[in-house]
């Protein structure tokens, strides 16, 4: 199955003490084992690195560890989806026309990458946020791990 992972799924999969680790880790492991075909947005690489290195409460990891987690778990097994300049502009124009603002802008860009990947499942911890940005047909493909 083709699966797209939001950044928050990757972060949860990498950190054993994350509250969603036990549901997120199998998603990444299935991709690494070749059981599923995995996709992530290019933006998620930088976002995962930033989150991993700045987690509150002493839970952050060293920059070299963050890079190792991304390199070994994502770059070796997942296809990286990039939006073209035209796709980026179209997505932002649609967001503006629909009144999408603030942090939801990143959700709409990640969702556009998920759609571009052709994934049958779009995994996110923000199911409601993603589902509120799209039509009924796509909503059925958006789920938590």
What residues fall within each predicted segment?
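Short, well-structured N-terminal submotif of metal-dependent ribonuclease cores
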Residues: 1-40, 55-68, 132
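Short beta-strand segments at enzyme active-site cores
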Residues: 39-42, 124
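Alpha-helix C-capping/helix-to-loop hinge sites
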Residues: 13, 31-34, 51, 55, ...
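Glycine/small-residue-rich phosphate/adenosyl-binding loop
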Residues: 45, 58-75, 79
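Acidic, PIN/NYN-like endoribonuclease modules and their adjacent C-terminal/linker elements
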Residues: 2, 108-145
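Active-site neighborhoods of divalent-metal-dependent phosphate/nucleic-acid chemistry enzymes
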Residues: 79-125
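Alpha-helix/helix-capping structural signal
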Residues: 8-9, 43, 109, 128
């Amino acid at each position: 199955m083709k699966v797209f992972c939001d950044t928050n799924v990757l972060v949860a999969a990498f950190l054993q003490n994350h509250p969603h680790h036990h549901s997120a880790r199998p998603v990444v492991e299935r991709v690494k084992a070749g059981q599923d075909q995995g996709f992530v947005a290019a933006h998620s690489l930088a976002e995962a690195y930033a989150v991993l290195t700045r987690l509150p409460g002493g839970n952050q990891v060293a920059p070299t560890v963050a890079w190792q987690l991304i390199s070994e778990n994502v770059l070796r097994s997942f296809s990286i989806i990039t939006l073209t300049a035209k796709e980026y502009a179209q997505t932002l124009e649609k967001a503006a026309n629909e009144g999408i603002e603030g942090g939801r802008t990143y959700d709409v860009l990640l969702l556009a990458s998920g759609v571009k990947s052709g994934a049958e499942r779009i995994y996110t911890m923000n199911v409601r946020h993603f589902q509120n940005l799209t039509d009924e047909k796509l909503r059925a493909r958006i789920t938590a791990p």
